[in-house]
Amino acid sequence: MSPGGPRPSSRKRKLRGRDKGGPDISAVNSFFLKYSFPYAWALLRLREMVRSGSRPGQVISSGRQPGAKLPNGKKGTHVRKIAHFNVDSACPVQSDSESQTDTLQGLDGCASLLRDILKNEDSGSEMVYSENRCNSKPLEGRKNRSKKKGPEKHVPSVVRKEILSSENRKWISNEASTGSDTAQRWSLQDHYRMYSPIIYQALCEHVQTQMSLMNSLALKNGPNGIHAVCHTMSNSGSQATPHSGFGCSPSASVWPPQQPSCPLMVHSEVQTDADNQFESQSQATSVKYGDVPRDPFSVHPGVACGLPHADSPAVAKSRQLDLTSCILPQQRAPKEAELLKCFQTHTSLFPAHGKDALSDSQAYQSPSQLQPAFLATNEEKCAKEQFEEATNEGKHLSTHVQDAKIAKNVQQAENVSQTAEKIRLAKCLLGELKALMEEDSEVQRLVTEVEACVSGLSAVSGHPNVEVEIALALQPLRSENAQLRRQLRILNQRLREQEKTEKGPGNLELFSLQSLNMSLQNQLQESLKSQELLQSKNEELLKVIENQKEENKKFTTLFKDKEQTLLHNKQQFDIEMTRVKMELEEALANEKNLRFKLETAEKESQILGITLRQRDAEVARLRELTRTLQSSMAKLLSDLSMDTARCRMGNSLTKSLLNVYDQQLQQDPAPAQTSIMSYLNKLETNHSFIHSKLLNNEAAIEPDRLCESVLPPQRPPHSDAGTADGGSASGTVSAASVEDSDMDCETLTVIEDGCNVDSTVYIPFARNTSKKHSPLCKRLSPQPKLSVAAAQLVSGSAQTSKGESKPRAPAVCSSRNEAEDAPGDLSSTYDTEDVQLLRKIKEAIGKIPAAAEHAKEQATHHGPSAHPSPGVPVKGSIVPDSSFLNSDLMSDWSISSFSTFTSHDEQDFRNGLAALDANIARLQKSLKTGLLEK
């Protein structure tokens, strides 16, 4: 398990042994064997090299051995298969020297002997293997418990570490061996007899490699490879089991890292990364522990047996060797003995080489060493005994090997129990070291304890001459290695020659391929250049695209701003448009109203112009009418005066009065002077005719006299003093009659024009004259024979006369009486035209309703004035007007009423005409202003 991995929870720190501590025990065991039994250690290394022989038919270079590769995770029983080898394949090629000829003969004999041995032992080895397989089953359950704790891990480095569980390790104590001091020996010759000549050649090659390594220890610093060596121990207190225990021992190898021997994949339960420094070799070696089962009762050192290579003859079906093929202990023990016997036979076949080896080994021998023959016989005896025990019992293998030093020094054999205790202690300490690898303080403590234990073992580790003995024993193998090297050189030369001959026809193809390769390389370079150009262009285009994207972003922001401004402006424009539309609609409505008003105003102006022209025409016609009325009134008065013969001549007008009146008129001229003067002249010219007629009717003068006698007392007290004699009354009557005639004609024309429905009837604004004359008109009481309107006027005059002065009533009554007295005179004297004209005037006056109200207002306004102006007629002149009109209507008019005509009456008449003109001008002005306003 790697140092970084989690530590199992079941692991507890103990100072004395564990229930499952096999890997630590094997590690300490191999470490102890290195220093306590150097000769046995070297022998184990030799056997391990023999086990890891090369495959048949493989060309082996000097000093290098390719390792066999096994598939990971595959477990199975590999039945031993013996290949039939050609004898010539193991023999060196003939050379010119005689030594090579002798070597070839010796090799042929050795190969034939080994073939016979292998053929004879095929059946026996297979039987032993079957027994072994049956006996190995009871311990598989124990193996499973130890192997389930950790996953497989493959260490790819050259220096590898492997933990071998020792559950199947058999510890056999020295007390349970034979009970004597003579140790059983393994026979290398018997062991070598079990192997083929190819394995023998591999053994010789590896020995040569180890010797060359030992000769160059001072120049090398580290190992190039690792060999796993198995130790087989004896245990007296336990039952024999068919599995042999496997330990690990470090050994140096010259195999390169490219071709490691036996790359092992293990189910590691405990793994250590500590490197053990071996002072004897001055070389750092890493320990690789294999996962193998052990027997946990007691620990004793034993003899090591090498782990075979993957192509070894037989492989045990055991769990501790999942990735390496091994030989079962029952098969391995006799085969190692046969191998030793084969080694002795081979050395006997080479006397010359043996002498050379003897002469070489004498330089390294010491007097205390044993001979190689004695070692071989001892090992052969031990191998035979182990083979018999394996075949008879089939359960355990008692392998107790001692070297020459242990045979001479019995005291070292007695100290085995003490060393076992130290080994157990070292095992526990190393287990603690592995468990606490990541903790610095604990690691330091455990390392110090391990060093203390190793210092206790240093007393038994001092045998430098063991390697010299091994070198003497392996001298024939070195000579064999030299022969194999020569054969290898020859084979390599042949191979090179074959390669040269085969290169001929392939040169053209090679040349074509090279040219094609060059062209393809050129094309590749060009394509790379074009690709670089395209990449540069692509980068430029990407930059341009990025710039365009940035510009597009800017433009999009600008467009958004513009759109927002346009939208805002559009909204404002819509608002303005709606407001303008509303204003335009209002303006159109106002325009329509104004047009309608203008049309109405134009129509009204047209109507007003028409009415104005009508008024002008009416005014002109009224003026003509006034003139005609004046003339007709003068004619009427003259006619009436001719009928009245009862008037007094004393009251008639004289020339002197007219002269006085002319003088007054000259002082105050008036526009109506000419008409009045003509009127007076007519009266004066007709006076003589009137006077002649009045003389014939004296009886009719009585009512006039009565009226004249009544009129002076009925005048108001504020009347003018100049009119006390009655002359002012006649002047007022004449002036009022003229004004009445003008106003009546104007009103009559308006009423006549009012018959049209479409035309507008306008009431004249000149109400001053109507105010003056309306009381006069309403006070009139004409005859019922004249018209119905006259009767209405008479009835209305009673109501309107109530607001005026009551002293008028006697005059009215007298006038009525006079009218009643003289109906016949009027009918005889009136002209028909004058009668019709008077009727029209009376009807027109009767159709003006507001005349009475304005007369009341004017009467109240002018009443209090005690000093009336000369242009305004006083109230006292109104009563003679009514009497004058009544006398106009009646036939009893007297000419004496005109005898009182003075300048004051003329002034009133002139003022009335001026007021009429002013009223007409005001009417025209008001019409013009009204048109302008509209």
Curated annotation (Swiss-Prot):
Cellular compartments annotated: Cytoplasm, Cytoskeleton, Microtubule organizing center, Centrosome, Centriolar satellite
Coiled coil found in the keyword field: yes
Chain segments carrying region Disordered: 1-22, 55-75, 128-156, 708-740, 793-829, 852-877
Top-rank lineage group of the source organism: Eukaryota
Keywords: Coiled coil, Cytoplasm, Cytoskeleton, Phosphoprotein
Gene Ontology CC entries for this record: centriolar satellite; ciliary basal body; cytoplasm
Coiled-coil residue spans: 432-606
Keyword Cytoplasm: yes
Function description: Negatively regulates centriole duplication. Negatively regulates CEP63 and CDK2 centrosomal localization.
Family annotation (PANTHER family): COILED-COIL DOMAIN-CONTAINING PROTEIN 14 (PTHR22367:SF2)
Assembly and interaction partners: Interacts with CEP63.
Protein name stated in the entry: Coiled-coil domain-containing protein 14
Source organism: Mus musculus
Gene symbol of the encoding locus: Ccdc14
